[in-house]
Amino acid sequence: MTNTKYYPEVNSNADFAGLEREILKFWQDNNIFQKSIDDRNGELEFIFYDGPPFANGLPHYGHLLTGFIKDVYARYQTIKGKKVERRFGWDCHGLPAEMQSEKELGISGRLAIANFGIEKFNAHCRASVMKYANDWEEYVTRQARWVNFKNSYKTMDKNFMESVLWAFKELYNKGLLYESMRVMPYSWACETPLSNFETRLDNSYRERADKAVTVSFVLSHPVATTTGSFKEYRILAWTTTPWTLPSNLALAVGSDIDYALVPKNDVCYIIAAYSVSKYAKELGLSGEENFEIIKGSALQGLNYKSLFDYFENHPNSFKIFAGDFVVEGDGTGVVHMAPGFGEDDQILCESKGIELVCPVDNSGKFTKEIPDLEGLQVFDANDKIIIKLKEQGNWLKTEQYIHNYPHCWRTDTPLIYKAVPSWYVKVTQFKDRMVELNQQINWIPFHVKDNLFGKWLENARDWSISRNRFWGTPLPVWKSDDPKYPRIDVYGSIEELEKDFGVKVTDLHRPFIDELTRPNPDDPTGKSTMRRIEDVFDCWFESGSMPYGQAHYPFENKEWFEDHFPADFIVEYSAQTRGWFYTLMVLSTALFDRPPFLNCICHGIILDSTGQKLSKRLNNYADPLELFDKYGSDALRVTMLSSNVVKGQELLIDKDGKMVFDTLRLFIKPIWNAYHFFTMYANTDSLKGKLNFSSKNVLDVYILSKLKIAVQKIEESLDNFDTQTAYHAVSEFFEVLNNWYIRRSRARFWKSEKDTDKQNAYNTLYSCLDTMAIAMSALVPMISEAIYKGLHHCEERNDTALSGKSNVIVRKDTSLDKAISGVSHKIATALSVPCNDAISVHLCNYPTLSDFEINHELVATMDNVLDICSNSLFIRSTENIRVRQPLASIAIISKHNNNLKDFEDLIKDEINVKAVIYRDDLENYASKKLSINFPMLGKRLPHKMKEIIAASKKGEWEAIAGGLAICGETLNSDEYKLVLEPYSHIKGAASFENNSSLLILDLELTPELIEEGYARDIVRFIQQARKDADFSITDRILIEIISEFNLSKIIDNYGDFIKEQTLGEFAKNFTPDYVSKVELENHQIQLKVKKS
């Protein structure tokens, strides 16, 4: 009779990478991704915004991490019945593209680009910006992430750019834009200003050593003093930017700070009293002197002589003012003011009628206004300035100052602060509203809402959105070129441009947009012309415009956008609280008075195993594709998303992929092992599993209850955007399925009778695998698909994805009309699994098991049984007593023994003891010890910790309702733990049931017990020989044992047991199929086996 096999022949040692490649091909050939979208009618939608990456570099582990998270929730919401569009996007404009093009073209700087030609330069940017797009698609596809590349949006597309123009004009019309010359962080390497939040992006600060100089400024008039008169009065100022001193126009002091008048020869030095000791050497002090003290307010309004003659006649300058930013700390308590190079400096000086000077050009070099430094880069000018100060007699001290200093996030060069003209969004005008709208957002981790992001919003500054660069969306601002006839025009659409300029606009980029000019309507002479300002948008403005830009709103899809805004979910690295999340929030608040998203995950950063940033230079990480080819992408997905990195913390990953291998071994392989076990025995027995939850077998009810608990836990976790807990639920379930249910049910699978009990076992295991394949499909999409396809296999194909090995021909099963044949419609509905038409696990609906009731009492009791058994096995391991060695008894000391008695035989068999003894006199064997949670309690009661520790050691405490009383305080449940501790003379003991019960193993070995243990060893040796000889599990065998060790008594007493366990008969003088040599109690044993 032919053995009918209903399932693929599954390889226990699967090639998971090869399996995944077959799954990817299956998805592509059958258009599964698009089907998963089309199958949802759109009544329920999950709106997901995919933040646009730059495509001028390869994806790194951070991109993959973000992509895995995006994919998990998109897949999950899909099987929850929602339509989830996943449109990919590309960030195309800005410095990354320009810097790459400059490098490839061999040019550098704005002047070189202008000479090369803006049209040619931008054409190169356009061509190069998508250089790695195909590589991105390969990486993203290989990581099993489903996205729509064909309909991707690009920030350089005309439609996207037009929406950006609309947003700008909307802000302008709302009065939320202004133009100003303000001091900003400035990248002289890129020749452009940066937003204040760009200097707060990850890794933008570096430790840097600068020369700090203390300079003396000569006052124009004496200071009123009681200590006598001096030839000169000098006030000391300290700065870490000596290059700004040629532009000094004022000094600032703290009005309430005490300043000392320090005499040296015929000069009186003025310095904050707190700083005098730091200058003892330079001022010739012994430390015993007393000085006259005056308040900073007494210095206000005094004039001083300019250090240099560059701006000595600058109006209203060279005075001392009070500044509330001057505080005690580093320096001298006196701040030198260069309003062209400091934000506080500019604000204070402008309030005093002092116009700024800025003698530094776009490349960070001094201009002709400083003739003896002209053409010198500002940082290179420090030494020359210090020399000049010494020559003039204004120098007092130079020191090395090590501090964290902002650097350009593109070039890694130190920034300067420099006054530049720019257009600003009046963020400060509506920042309070942003704070309010932020409360509508669910942040993961939760503390981001009011801390990392919330505090950033509270301190938001006006946002500079213009950049004097080339490759970007142009600011739609035209100005009159004649200041006699001022006029500003702002455009918000291509239609408006075409109407005013009378030409067809096909490209909004420079230089084409710059060529649009027209006569100034406000000039009666007709001589002036309206010309576009040269600036382009900060690329962060464009990425912040992504929600409406991708839809070409409001020119198209107006109703669609308004129905799909805000997003249900976005995710990025936590530094984006200063980047994309922030710009989305600014523009969404200003334009729509709504939060841009409702749920946001801020994940952490991935570092190497030593905690260093992943770097090509350090060569400290593997190419992700290599890991995929070695271990599969599911393993990397689990490694990342089950770690704390999803909660904003760091993940350290080794270059060799050991962590990923461990995930494969400890998480993926157990899932596959359960599937392999089912298919192997089901094919051997020619039985099909059915989706059925009606078995009354206690193990079946238990595992089905655990299944529903796991399914609910996964659902609850993913609803709360918590992949860590979801993965734990999967792992915990398969631990119980493999190491308890399957192992305890093996006799049911092994027996020859195809009775109801055996079918129930197959149905139960099938139901577990099928249900979990769907429930965990978002978490491990590849292996879930392979298992689901294998369980529902109904077509003839050469399909590696079903088996985990190559070239396996699987028979056609025409009888499998329904994926859940034999199950009532009621149960099928409860599972919410589409029957015949779900060719992929990702086209199913999430299982609910609503008609199956969890047996909570059974689960609690069986969990206790598991706890008893695992603790007992741990004791055996600790005492070096193998599991095959029987023990006399186990004593279970508990108040809940009645529940455990039903499982006595199971406990005896699992831990290999002869008897179970039940007791309830726990006080005779153990006592409760108090364990204090010191970090937790120390926060609340720091002053009583010493007293509480002493009392806990003496046992001076009492358990009460709702907590624990000690030293007059009531401890909360998270501040302590009561640990059940056996008395010192009790051996082989362990607590269980949350430290409320105790078990004690009898560790004494009698001769009879030892003999039975040897019999069990012999069974193991024979079973291993069967496996090594590649016998089938159903083959009957002949056995011969040859040994110097006297086994006759063991064979006489336990021969029937050995034969039953091994399907064997003892025999002699046969030609063996396999011979093995083993060792028992230091004696050699030769074992011969042969198929009978």
From Swiss-Prot:
- Spell out the subcellular localization from the entry: Cytoplasm
Q: Which SUPFAM superfamilies does the UniProt entry name for this protein?
A: Anticodon-binding domain of a subclass of class I aminoacyl-tRNA synthetases, Nucleotidylyl transferase, ValRS/IleRS/LeuRS editing domain
Name the source's superkingdom: Bacteria
Which residues of this UniProt protein bind ATP? K616
Motif 'HIGH' region: residue span? Answer: 53-63
Give the record's keywords alphabetically.
Aminoacyl-tRNA synthetase, ATP-binding, Cytoplasm, Ligase, Metal-binding, Nucleotide-binding, Protein biosynthesis, Zinc
Q: Per the record, what are the reactions this protein catalyses?
A: tRNA(Ile) + L-isoleucine + ATP = L-isoleucyl-tRNA(Ile) + AMP + diphosphate
Q: Where is this motif: 'KMSKS' region?
A: 613-617
Q: Membrane-spanning residues where?
A: none
* GO biological process terms, semicolon-separated: isoleucyl-tRNA aminoacylation
Catalytic activity, EC: 6.1.1.5
Required cofactor names:
Zn(2+)
According to its UniProt record, this protein's enzyme class is ligase
Record function comment: Catalyzes the attachment of isoleucine to tRNA(Ile). As IleRS can inadvertently accommodate and process structurally similar amino acids such as valine, to avoid such errors it has two additional distinct tRNA(Ile)-dependent editing activities. One activity is designated as 'pretransfer' editing and involves the hydrolysis of activated Val-AMP. The other activity is designated 'posttransfer' editing and involves deacylation of mischarged Val-tRNA(Ile).
List, alphabetically, the NCBIfam families matched. ileS
Q: What is known of its domains?
A: IleRS has two distinct active sites: one for aminoacylation and one for editing. The misactivated valine is translocated from the active site to the editing site, which sterically excludes the correctly activated isoleucine. The single editing site contains two valyl binding pockets, one specific for each substrate (Val-AMP or Val-tRNA(Ile)).
Give the protein family.
Answer: Belongs to the class-I aminoacyl-tRNA synthetase family. IleS type 2 subfamily.
HAMAP family annotated for this entry?
Ile_tRNA_synth_type2
This chain belongs to which protein, by name? Answer: Isoleucine--tRNA ligase
